[in-house]
Amino acid sequence: MTKLSKRVKVIQSKIDRNKFYSLDDALNLVKECATAKFDESIDVAVQLGIDAKKSDQVVRGAVVLPAGTGKYVRVAVFAQGEKAEQAKAAGAEIVGMEDLADQIKSGKIDFDVLIASPDTMKIVGTLGQVLGPRGLMPNPKVGTVTPDVATAVKNAKAGQVQFRVDKAGIVHASIGRRSFEPTALKSNLLALLEALNKAKPPASKGVYLKKVAVSSTMGAGVRVDQASLQAAA
């Protein structure tokens, strides 16, 4: 039998896995249990009332978290001419065309988000095998293929997170760090839930936001009472 560490035992003693906590209590408890020696990520898992196997019920999008993510984001942009200058002015670390494509093909991917102007997609389209598995392929559904590259860069820098439902119908996302105040985590979570509601597929029937749980990188999940979410929205 695996011996549990002292830290894990403490976490398990504090969290009742069968209980639904109010949003405020859940966030405070997750922060309290995030005792690793680094600034743990605070994450959320949302079970959606959809059939993820059906193409008309895929939920995907992006949202700028009002309190940011607590992470420094390096942005690369495919653009030329005036749009390239706009991307640089907005704070993009890397801006290019064929030179950027060659860099990516060689395996040098020194960025967290990739944005593309629509007129560059002929080049970007050849990079799918490299970018796709890494979740970096630009897509208009999440605002990373856009003529307004400057705004896209600013959004990425400001704390935009992308979300996509997995095969089990669950959306996973980070809403901040342990060092964030509970009010900041709360505003980020509510912004994410609002974005998920806006992305609800017309084909989805019944309860849409079925279950919500928050956790830290090294901690256990804490289930959130739905009534407290509705009251906070």
UniProtKB/Swiss-Prot annotation:
The keyword Zinc-finger does not apply. Signal peptide: none annotated. Gene3D superfamilies: 3.30.190.20, 3.40.50.790. One of its GO terms (biological process) is translation. GO terms for cellular component: cytosolic large ribosomal subunit. Keywords: Repressor, Ribonucleoprotein, Ribosomal protein, RNA-binding, rRNA-binding, Translation regulation, tRNA-binding. It comes from the Bacteria. GO terms for molecular function: rRNA binding; structural constituent of ribosome; tRNA binding. Disulfide bonds: none annotated. Binds directly to 23S rRNA. The L1 stalk is quite mobile in the ribosome, and is involved in E site tRNA release. Part of the 50S ribosomal subunit. Belongs to the universal ribosomal protein uL1 family. This is Large ribosomal subunit protein uL1. It comes from Polynucleobacter necessarius subsp. necessarius (strain STIR1).
